[in-house]
């Protein structure tokens, strides 16, 4: 791999960080763009002025047109942020104005059980829209102390929009399902930007109106703006049917809802959704397949209604659709926010994530690894990360320079290739100091501007990020080990709640996945996440991401998709090492069939699962200091390149066991130096930084 030393020392703008600039200096915007370049930034993320009507105000559009013209004249690439406030989709309230029917909706369940005959009368409350469905079922009380609903005895019950009158026999239960707006207690009411009500991301008409009001006017006012932009940045569109604060209890446990869902469910599965509704709220393991199917459908619908629709519009106007979604860190948030976040992310042109815990000890390593999987499925050159040191800013502020260095390395070793940043600089050192007090965003909407970095620090950070981006451009992590992405286990166990708690059973897959992931990282091992679709592909080709897969590790699951199990059986027979950590699954995710896998597969401890024989792959060993993370790549001229990253606070020493005296090129993205060395030596990896080693022979 031939490296241009001058290019490595001064990497191109496309690889450097882009600050989030929501507000520009009123009279000195062109000069401020020069300040951004002077501080080493590569471009910006910006938007139509968000106050005074957002895109409905011609003055805002005219001002944005002038900013875009100045950006193009200054040579600064730009991304277009698509919202006024947060989250994307509301248009600062424009979208729902005069169209309240497009608001996010949830379905709640009212349950009435009787053990003696009685008449039931029910009337809808003032917060709800209408009754959607009702049915009664027999209850089996033959087992002492239990009341088991017999779902096969379902009898629909007549109802009007707002009332029900029904005769219940002994040992019957009546389920009433009602629709209401999904707003109170949601992320709409607990964020730093607004209290706006929000659209239903399951409804393509709502998303179309968002396009009509917040995309079309921008293109009309600034023709070609989306074609000239790097991409659109959409910000955390999501369902609002779950609660986010532990100190709040609400009378409604909400299921995401939209009128088209029953028809889509029938198209996808050939089943009637209505009789399954009780199983989505409660019940034993017999209910798990209904939930897996429902939440898979939800992910599909959001992916098409929101992401694919916006992506297609952007493509039609010569642009790309990107941004990030809510709660990338935990699978339970993948389910309750999107049904299956992966189904939504993979519809992007360029997936993304955000990082809130921007210090190495607080960093969530699974976040980037999950999005890395989406980027691989999209076929994109990595993905975007929005760096937001908003989670515990006091901790970040203890050593902001080192913390951001470590965070950037952790991002890029996991697949990030573009960085948008809320880690702001102090621009006092530029020119006559006129930007000393300038704030690039509304602090009431986006939180306090803290100005962590001076000019020298920001130039160094931008150079470091730019050099990593230059070296990793177009390259993917080469891994022989995959970890299974067991989203179906969470889908099966998730039920709507009256508060923000999800329960130990529901979060079990998250915790099991993290135990396995952290054990891999503690061994210095790299890996890829793979879902059921990927396992099927590996069974067909033996490869994922161009690399032969030799080892498949599965976290402790109770539920597994049948196609995943079929692929695992085939791969095990072909000699691939398949290990279940902690326990074997026992439920088929789609049929509910009991699985008996003991004897066919082995459940081992987490530590046993991650012990990979050194002969299987080249692996640097940490001799002293913090464990060094590493990733291996194949360069464009087919050489092996290692990225060695030390996220710790002291230096580390590593060695490649069995290495010979082959020549290698060592690239330090912090200093910009390139040296020629021999491979058979000890290597020092500085604290919170990384180095690259290319084996030349």
Task: Specify the residue positions occupied by each region the protein language model found.
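Basic/polar N-terminal segments that are highly enriched at the extreme N-terminus
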Residues: 1-3
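Acidic/aromatic-lined carbohydrate-recognition and catalytic surfaces
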Residues: 46-208
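Carbohydrate-binding surfaces of carbohydrate-active enzymes
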Residues: 7-22, 27-33, 42-49, 55-80, ...
């Amino acid at each position: 791999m031939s490296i241009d030393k001058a290019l490595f020392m001064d990497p191109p703008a496309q690889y450097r960080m882009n600050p989030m600039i929501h507000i520009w200096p009123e009279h000195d915007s062109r000069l401020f763009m020069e300040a951004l370049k002077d501080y080493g930034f590569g471009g910006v993320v910006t938007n139509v002025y968000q106050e005074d009507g957002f895109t409905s105000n011609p003055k805002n559009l005219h001002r944005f047109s002038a900013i875009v013209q100045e950006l193009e004249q200054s040579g600064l690439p730009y991304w277009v942020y698509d919202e006024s406030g947060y989250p994307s989709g509301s248009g600062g309230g424009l979208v729902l104005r005069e169209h309240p029917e497009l608001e996010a909706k949830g379905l709640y369940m009212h349950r009435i059980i009787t053990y003696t005959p009685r008449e039931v009368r029910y009337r809808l409350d003032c917060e709800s829209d209408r009754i959607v469905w009702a049915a009664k079922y027999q209850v089996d009380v033959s087992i002492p102390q239990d009341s088991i609903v017999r779902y096969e005895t379902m009898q629909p019950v007549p109802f009007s929009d707002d009332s029900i009158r029904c005769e219940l026999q002994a040992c019957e239960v009546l389920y009433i399902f009602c629709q209401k707006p999904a707003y109170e207690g949601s992320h709409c009411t607990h964020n730093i930007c607004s209290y706006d009500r929000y659209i239903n991301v399951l409804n393509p008409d709502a998303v179309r109106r968002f396009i009509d009001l917040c995309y079309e006017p921008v293109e009309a006012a600034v023709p070609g703006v989306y074609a000239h932009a790097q991409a659109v940045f959409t910000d955390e569109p999501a369902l609002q049917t779950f609660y986010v604060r532990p100190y709040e209890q609400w009378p409604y446990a909400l299921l995401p809802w939209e009128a088209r869902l029953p028809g889509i469910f029938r198209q996808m599965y050939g089943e009637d959704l209505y009789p399954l509704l009780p199983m989505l709220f409660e019940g034993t393991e017999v209910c798990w397949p209904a939930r897996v199917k429902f939440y898979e459908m939800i992910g599909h619908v959001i992916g098409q209604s929101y992401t694919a629709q916006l992506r297609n519009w952007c493509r039609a106007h010569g642009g790309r659709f990107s941004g990030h979604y809510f709660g990338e860190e935990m699978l339970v948030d993948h389910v309750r926010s999107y049904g299956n976040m992966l189904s939504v992310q993979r519809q992007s042109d360029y997936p993304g994530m955000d990082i809130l815990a921007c210090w190495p000890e607080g960093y969530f390593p699974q976040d980037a690894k999950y999005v890395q999987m989406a980027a691989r499925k999209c076929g994109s050159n990595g993905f975007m990360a929005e760096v937001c040191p908003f989670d515990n800013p006091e901790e970040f502020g203890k050593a902001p320079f080192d913390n951001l260095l470590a965070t950037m390395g952790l991002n890029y070793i996991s697949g990030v290739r573009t960085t948008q940043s809320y880690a702001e600089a102090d621009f006092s050192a530029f020119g006559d100091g006129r930007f000393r007090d300038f704030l690039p965003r509304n602090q009431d909407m986006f939180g306090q501007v803290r100005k962590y970095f001076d000019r020298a620090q920001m130039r160094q950070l931008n150079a470091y990020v730019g050099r990593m981006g230059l070296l990793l451009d177009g390259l993917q992590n080469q891994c022989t080990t995959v970890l299974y992405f067991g989203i179906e286990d969470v889908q099966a166990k998730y039920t709507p709640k009256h508060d923000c708690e999800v329960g130990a059973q529901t979060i079990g897959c998250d915790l099991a996945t993290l135990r396995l992931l952290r054990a891999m990282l503690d061994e210095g091992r790299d890996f890829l996440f793979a879902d059921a679709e990927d396992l099927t592909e590996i069974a067909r080709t033996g490869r994922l991401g161009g690399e032969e897969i030799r080892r498949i590790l599965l976290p402790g699951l109770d539920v597994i998709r049948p196609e995943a199990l079929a692929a695992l059986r085939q791969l095990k027979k072909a000699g691939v090492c398949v290990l279940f950590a902690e326990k074997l699954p026992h439920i088929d995710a789609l049929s509910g069939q009991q699985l008996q896998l003991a004897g066919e597969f082995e459940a081992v401890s987490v530590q046993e699962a991650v012990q990979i024989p050194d002969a299987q792959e080249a692996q640097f060993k940490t001799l002293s200091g913090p464990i060094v993370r590493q990733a291996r790549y194949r360069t464009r001229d087919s050489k092996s390149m290692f990225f060695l990253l030390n996220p710790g606070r002291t230096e580390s020493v590593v060695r490649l066991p069995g290495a010979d005296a082959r020549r290698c090129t060592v690239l330090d993205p912090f200093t910009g130096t390139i040296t020629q060395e021999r491979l058979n030596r000890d290597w020092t990896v500085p604290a919170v930084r990384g180095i690259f080693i290319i084996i030349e022979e």
